[in-house]
Curated annotation (Swiss-Prot):
Subunit structure: Interacts with the Sec translocase complex via SecD. Specifically interacts with transmembrane segments of nascent integral membrane proteins during membrane integration.
Natural source organism: Klebsiella pneumoniae (strain 342)
Annotated NCBIfam families: PRK01318.1-1, PRK01318.1-3, PRK01318.1-4, yidC_nterm, yidC_oxa1_cterm
Protein's cellular compartments: Cell inner membrane
Biased composition (Low complexity): 29-41
S-S bridge residues: none
Name of the protein in question: Membrane protein insertase YidC
Region annotated Disordered, chain positions: 28-52
Keyword Magnesium found: no
Keywords (A to Z) from UniProt: Cell inner membrane, Cell membrane, Chaperone, Membrane, Protein transport, Transmembrane, Transmembrane helix, Transport
Amino acid sequence: MDSQRNLLIIALLFVSFMIWQAWEQDKNPQPQQQTTQTTTTAAGSAADQGVPASGQGKLITVKTDVLELTINTNGGDIEQALLLAYPKTLKSTEPFQLLETTPQFVYQAQSGLTGRDGPDNPANGPRPLYSVDKEAFVLADSQDEIVIPLTYTDKAGNVFTKTFTLKRGGYAVNVGYSVQNASEKPLEVSTFGQLKQTAALPTSRDTQTGGLSTMHTFRGAAFSTSDTKYEKYKFDTILDNENLNVSTKNGWVAMLQQYFTTAWVPQNNGTNNFYTANLGNGIVAIGYKSQPVLVQPGQTDKLQSVLWVGPAIQDKMAAVAPHLDLTVDYGWLWFISQPLFKLLKFIHSFLGNWGFSIIVITFIVRGIMYPLTKAQYTSMAKMRMLQPKIQAMRERLGDDKQRQSQEMMALYKAEKVNPLGGCFPLIIQMPIFLALYYMLSASVELRHAPFILWIHDLSAQDPYYILPIIMGATMFFIQKMSPTTVTDPMQQKIMTFMPVIFTVFFLWFPSGLVVYYIVSNLVTIIQQQLIYRGLEKRGLHSREKKKS
C-alpha cells in the first residue's frame, strides 16, 4: 500500500464524517419561518412543575462592563441578556443577545420561591410583583460589583427580598433570597431556577449555515448530578414529553448553543429535583426545585443560587460549578479536544495570537507523531520492494485467490512486513484532525479571533478561499513527490483529482483548521525528505522520477 492509496482511505473517512454531520444536523429542530405565540399556554404547563409563568411588570436594566440584563419585576425573571464583549457578527457593533423575549422567540432565565408558602406558587396567586427603587443600574468605574434588591411583601406581612449581584468582568449572577417571616406559623419555601426557550430557532437567530462542511454543534439542554458528570438532553426529547425527573445533591441544569451557555447552579446542602418540561407552543424548559426549608416565625432565612449567562469559558465555568466546563461541545472526541485546547491556550498565553498558536501546536503534534510517520513510510517502502515478488506469485497462481492470500501472508511474515503498517498512522491522525475540527468550532476564544492579513476570524471560512487553494497545492506537491505502485486506471484518476476534491471541501472549513492542515502538509514534505534519505541508505528507496 503506497501513500497515494492512503489518500483514498483518508477521503473515505472524511466523506463519511461529513455525511454523518449532515445527518445529525437534519435530526435537530429546524429554523422556523412562522411567528410563534409564547404567552398563552406556558402558564398552565409550568404550573405543573410548581413554576408559574411571568406576567406583565416593570422592566429594569442592569449593566456591567460585560453584561446588560433586563429583569421583569413580575417574578424577577431575566428576560434579556446582552453580552457586551461579544459582537453579534464580526463587523457588527451590536452585542450578541443570548436571552431574548419576543413574539417570535423566547429564551428566559426564571427563578423564585415556590413551596407551600412561596410567592411563586400558583396556588398562592399571581407571581409576586417586586418593588425596586430605580429602573436602571449601572456598574460604576469605582465599583467591583453591583447589587440589585427586589422586594415583595405578601398579605400576611411576610417580606421576600430577591437580590441580584453581578461582579465586574463576570458572567456568574448570584441570585439570593431573604425570607422574613412576620406570621405566627412557619413558612415552607423552596427555591427554583428554570430556563425556557423556543425549541425551533427563528431564521434571524440561526447560526448554522448548512451543507456538508458546516460544523454541527449541540443546541439543547444538559445537566450534571452527583452520579452523572454531564449529560445532554435534546429539545426533541422534551417536545416528545420524555421528561427528566431526577433528585440529586449538587449539580446544575443548563441550555447550550455554539459558544454560549446558560446554567442554573443551586447553592444549598439539600436535595434538588432536576426536571424538564414541554411548556406548549414549541417552548421547552429545564430547571431545578430545591427541597423545602422552614422559616420560623419572627426569623429571617437566606437562600442562594447562581446563574451563569454568557460565553462558554471553560476555566471560569469550572470555578462556578464542577463539570460546568463540559458544556463546551467537543463532541465524541472531547477527550482529545480538551487537552489540545489547554495546550493551545497555554501557547497563546506566550504568543498572543491564536493563528500562530495553531501553527506551533501543529509542529508539536507532528513532532510527536514523527515515529509513526517514519514507520508508515518504511512500511510502504518495504511493500514496494515486495511488489515484483507479489506480481510473480499472482501470475503463478492464477485465479486461485485462497492460495494467493495464504502465500502473500507467508511472504509478509518472512519479510517482516506489516501490510497495515501504512494505514495505522493515518488512523491515528484522523481523530486528531477531527478533534481539532471540534475544538476550533466550539471554543468561544476562537470566535472572531484574527490571524494575519485577510484572516479576521479563525473560526470562519476564508472569505477569499486563498488558504484552501494553498492547502490543495501542498497536497498536490506531496502527491507528486510520493512514489506509487497503483496501476488501476480508476484509482489513478481518483488520486489525480484528490487535491481538487479536498480543496473544494475545505472551502467552507474554519480558517484555523485550514491553517493547521497547510502547516501539517509542509511538515510532511520536510519529514518525507528526511525519511527518504534514510531509506535510500538502506536500499529501500530510490529517487526516480515519477511517470506522469
